[in-house]
């Protein structure tokens, strides 16, 4: 039995979960999310709990049991609390700004880089060097943050670039000068 899959998902008061076949729809104060869950697992709702069980003991069913439970739990958390990723920009003259919905990054290239966030994702900038990506879908928020980081990943010699707020960048010593 999957350790993650067997844990029931508690549903907060203001969240409504609808299950139609393999389609799960979660509505909450922050919005609505829908997802098709793999047919190898069965989803049941009783009182304020959603449980995910395997239909059989096949390898695929065992693999997707915990995944399906986590996807539904992330949907419930997203519509009730939301998700956010924080990024830091480090480097002389490196900065970010929001123009309309778009994020404009000045990170050492000859032209500024413009990133348009997908629907349902908000981008905010604090003090020109801190970017906050937020939304209700954990997967889309994470992908958007990764796209922003990929514009200028942190380099190991000076530490310049865009990094996650909780990321540790391993520093390297440069080559020794001539003697």
UniProtKB/Swiss-Prot annotation:
InterPro entries reported in the protein's UniProt record: Ribosomal_uL6-like, Ribosomal_uL6-like_a/b-dom_sf, Ribosomal_uL6_a/b-dom, Ribosomal_uL6_bac-type, Ribosomal_uL6_CS
Top-level taxon: Bacteria
UniProt keyword Ribonucleoprotein present: yes
SUPFAM superfamilies according to UniProt: Ribosomal protein L6
Any one Gene Ontology BP term: cytoplasmic translation
Gene Ontology cellular-component terms listed: cytosolic large ribosomal subunit
Keywords: Ribonucleoprotein, Ribosomal protein, RNA-binding, rRNA-binding
Single GO MF annotation: rRNA binding
Subunit: Part of the 50S ribosomal subunit.
Function: This protein binds to the 23S rRNA, and is important in its secondary structure. It is located near the subunit interface in the base of the L7/L12 stalk, and near the tRNA binding site of the peptidyltransferase center.
Family recorded in the similarity comment: Belongs to the universal ribosomal protein uL6 family.
UniProt protein name: Large ribosomal subunit protein uL6
Gene name linked to the record: rplF
């Amino acid at each position: 039995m999957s350790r993650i899959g067997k844990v029931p998902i508690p549903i907060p008061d203001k969240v409504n979960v609808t299950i139609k076949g393999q389609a799960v729809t979660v509505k909450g104060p922050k919005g609505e999310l829908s997802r098709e869950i793999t047919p190898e697992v069965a989803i049941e709702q009783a009182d304020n709990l959603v449980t995910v069980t395997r239909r059989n003991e096949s390898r695929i069913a065992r693999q997707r049991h915990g995944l399906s439970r986590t996807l539904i739990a992330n949907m419930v958390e997203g519509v009730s609390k939301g998700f956010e990723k924080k990024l830091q920009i480090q480097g002389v003259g490196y900065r970010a700004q929001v123009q309309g919905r778009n994020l404009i990054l000045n990170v050492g290239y000859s032209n500024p880089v413009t990133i348009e966030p997908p629907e349902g994702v908000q981008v905010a900038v604090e003090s020109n060097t801190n970017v906050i990506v937020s939304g209700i879908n954990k997967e889309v928020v994470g992908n958007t943050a990764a796209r922003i980081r990929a514009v200028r990943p942190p380099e190991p010699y000076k530490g310049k670039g865009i990094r996650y707020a909780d990321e540790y960048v391993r520093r390297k010593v440069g080559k020794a000068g001539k003697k």
